[in-house]
Amino acid sequence: MSETFPETNTPVQTPSTESFVNKMNAGDKTIGNNIFSQDSDSNQQSSHQEPLSPPNPSPTPEKRQLDDEVDNSIEPESKKQKVEEETEASQTGVIQTEVSETVPEIESSVNKDSEPVNGVSEESENTNNEQEKPQEEAPEENPQEEVPEAKPQEEASGENPQEIPNDKPQDDEPDIQEVDPPKPVVPVFTEPAPKPPQEPDMNNLPENPIPQHQAKFVLNTIKAVKRNREAVPFLHPVDTVKLNVPFYYNYIPRPMDLSTIERKINLKAYEDVSQVVDDFNLMVKNCKKFNGEAAGISKMATNIQAQFEKLMVKVPPKELPAGTNVAEATSVATSPTTNKRKSVAESSSSHQHRDSVAAARPKRTIHPPKSKELPYETKPKNKKVAAELRFCNQTIKELMSKKHYNYNFPFLAPVDTVALNIPNYNEIVKQPMDLGTIQSKLANNEYENADDFEKDVRLVFKNCYLFNPEGTDVNMMGHRLEAVFDKKWANKPVPEPTPQNSDVSDREYSSEEEDNVEISEAMLSEIPAIQVMENQIIRMRKELDELKKEHLKKLREQQAARKKKKQQKGKRRAPKAKHTKDTQHQVQAPPEPPKLTPPQPVVTYEMKKQVSEMVPNLSDKKLNALIKIIQDDVQISNDDEVELDMDQLEDRTVLKLYDFLFGDKALKNSAGKKKKPVANNNLDELAHLRSQLALFDEGVNGQQGSDNGFMKVVNQEESSEDEASSESSEEE
């Protein structure tokens, strides 16, 4: 009898391929031995396990025995249980028949070939274990049909069964081997695509475009987005030549930009507001598709998209409610960034609510508005405050000048939290401030003094350092601009001590504002400049009257003296020689008229102008002498700096200054010339007086007759002098 082999799960060493092939080709004897060994194994295992599968109905018993051998060694335990009930009866009969037919033939060779049979059986078992892997990969529905195919394939190929690993099942291989996902195929373009046609298509404009109020709102929204700094790359279509992107249209078949959207709105190419939103989103999508999500320009596109969506929330409806004018809707839509009114749909209900509340409240007194012709602040500021505010105006212009633009541009306008994408700015900075706001407050006279101005400027830099930490660009710009401000503010003029009268005048002006006193001519006379001019006019008129009286009196006296001399000459026609000489001397040297006191000259505007223009050109020596002249009449507190105001100086002081500056020239001009006769001097004085009288219309019109009489007297005087000179020549 054949030896029984205990059933174990330990792996058996697989023989080499050459030994396996030689034994398979050894003949019927070797096959019989294999069949016997397989039958003995199956009989030994029948006590433990039931038959697994029915025999393969092959035409030859040798083939059928090999199939049974393969089935017993390859079939897994799970598959054996499935087909146990179906094949139990048929398999048992077939196996018994095969054993009864083969036992007489192989009984004699059992003892001889016991060792080879074991070896073959071991080889067959190992071979079957190796064939178990490809069979497990096959579907479970037909396990019997694939068993005979596995053996011939293995025999034909002659592969070494050791190459297939036995320690791990083949079903786990897909879990171990991880396959990378397929990468997207990047298209390779050889030729650039043509430029798409320009939008909109003028031949396919919609019949029912969006209404006018919606179009105006959307247009203003696009303009507001275009004013954003981050919208610069999206203002115009992409220039593929300038930007060196020839394959742009291969990736972007339908380009879009803000100017195209604006042109389509103006040409009424949109039927609904949603189409405008789609075009804007297409522009942002094209940017991210061509440049990538992480690019800087893609982030800029995201920021302007957020601003656009925030503004489009307030878009008016397509059909306005009844009783709403188009002008009201457009007024709401004209300024979407600064509009704070409620929507038009809520206007009717809000008006009703206000009317009901107004009826329940007590009526208040209505005060008339202030006159638009007068400024908001009629109180004149004193010189100290005015000088400080002038310096503040110069300082703000210096801070906002273009030469500091590299580091002052973040502070020129209020911070736009939407455009800069900093929604938490107002939470950190409680009191925002900028240079533009400071300049407008200066223009509106909202600062009382320079300290308030400095406080706001310091607030700008404080907010900058609070929101931007050290080391950031904006923080460094703030430090540079603050250094410019400190340098400029160090040159602020020192305020002069103000007298107590200024406080009294301020109180008077404040009381006048409270009482709303009307302005009259009497109030104008209180202005110092007008008072000075009025006093000068009165004084000049008095001086003119006195001068006229004096000159007329003197001329009449001279005329009377000449008449007496003529009468005396007529009585003395035959005198002696000595007497004639005496008379000749008397005629040649007529008695000098009494010396006239020169009239006090009148201070004119031209004289003041000449003095003021001459002062800057003086040397230090003359300037010191001029200051002494001023100090004689006016008390000056500060010796280092003298403010020369010609209107505040008295006339005598102005005359002294004029004589000091221009007196030498007059003497030099008169030294080289002969003395004019008294009549010519009088004529010059009269001409000067006439020029002064021309400045006053009233004096000229009222005293025209007296001037004519005065000229007649002068002419008579000239004729008498000529007669006297002719008589003296005849006597000689």
From Swiss-Prot:
Q: Does the keyword Lipoprotein apply?
A: no
The family database entries (CDD domains) matched by this protein are listed as: Bromo_BDF1_2_II
Q: Which residues form the NET domain?
A: 593-672
Q: Where is the composition biased (Basic residues)?
A: 561-579
Q: Which domain of life is it from?
A: Eukaryota
Q: Spans of biased composition, class Pro residues? A: 590-600
Q: Which SUPFAM superfamilies match?
A: Bromodomain (SSF47370)
Q: What is its main location?
A: nucleus
**Could you tell me where the Polar residues compositional bias lies?**
1-22, 89-100, 327-338
InterPro entries attached here? Bromo_chromatin_reader (IPR050935), Bromodomain (IPR001487), Bromodomain-like_sf (IPR036427), Bromodomain_CS (IPR018359), NET_dom (IPR027353), NET_sf (IPR038336)
Q: Where is the composition biased (Low complexity)?
A: 37-51
Compositionally biased intervals (Basic and acidic residues) = 370-380
Q: Provide the GO MF annotations for this entry.
A: lysine-acetylated histone binding
The reply on keyword Coiled coil is yes
Q: Which GO terms describe its biological process?
A: chromatin remodeling; DNA repair; regulation of DNA-templated transcription; sporulation resulting in formation of a cellular spore
Stated family: Belongs to the BET family.
What does the protein in this record do? Transcription factor involved in the expression of a broad class of genes including snRNAs. Required for sporulation and DNA-damage repair. Prevents the spreading of SIR silencing at telomeres and protects histone H4, but not H3, from deacetylation.
* Protein name, entry field: Bromodomain-containing factor 1
Q: Organism, per UniProt? A: Candida albicans (strain SC5314 / ATCC MYA-2876)
